[in-house]
Amino acid sequence: MRNPPALEQLVEALRCLPGVGPKSALRMAYYLLQRDRKGAGILAKSLDQALQVVSHCNLCNNFSEQEICPLCASPARDRTLLCIVEMPSDLMMLEQTQTYQGMYFVLMGRLSPLDGIGPRDIHLDKLLKRAQDGKVEEVILATNYTVEGEATAHYVSELLRARGIQVSRIARGLPMGGEIEHVDSGTLAQALLERRHVR
């Protein structure tokens, strides 16, 4: 027996979410229709609203309801620093540290040739325009330390350095509160290589 066409369409739509396969999508659809129809309506309305009003900031490429997001519009930010991150969640994590007061650029992904994601897919043309605006003095690469993140950082650094822009990379090392005996050898080796002099 097959499910009604509208239910099948809902299941297929839910499968677009990361990590959601056919069984999970079917369970979600059953739950929303059987146990939380009100929640399903709120979800549908919220998704529709977000699709209508949320786009990308013209400067940092982060999600925003305005052409220029509040962070980019803030006069308190240091416009000489530009930190490049892969995703909006990375920007949010950096903001939570309350230590960085510069500007951002969100790539909305990372280079991944195996997945068909090339330079055009991560807004590098927009990044180059931003980095060469005459205000930026240093670009900080804060991509993840994954194979794709490293490849992205390398590619972007080559593009920027060829244009005379100073580029730095966030450090790798031990996590705050971490104990050496519980750290993997790769992280420990990197922490030793990237050690700093004590002042």
Curated annotation (Swiss-Prot):
The keyword Zinc-finger belongs to this UniProt entry's keyword annotation: yes
Keyword DNA repair: yes
Taxonomic lineage from the root: Bacteria, Pseudomonadati, Pseudomonadota, Betaproteobacteria, Nitrosomonadales
Single annotated GO MF: DNA binding
Protein family per UniProt: Belongs to the RecR family.
Domain Toprim intervals: 80-175
Pfam families: RecR_C, RecR_HhH, RecR_ZnF, Toprim_4
Name of the featured protein: Recombination protein RecR
Function: May play a role in DNA repair. It seems to be involved in an RecBC-independent recombinational process of DNA repair. It may act with RecF and RecO.
PROSITE patterns: RECR, TOPRIM
Signal peptide as annotated in the record: none
Gene3D superfamilies, A to Z: 3.40.1360.10, 6.10.250.240, RecR Domain 1
C4-type zinc finger locations on the chain: 57-72
UniProt keywords, alphabetically: DNA damage, DNA recombination, DNA repair, Metal-binding, Zinc, Zinc-finger
Gene Ontology biological-process entries: DNA recombination; DNA repair
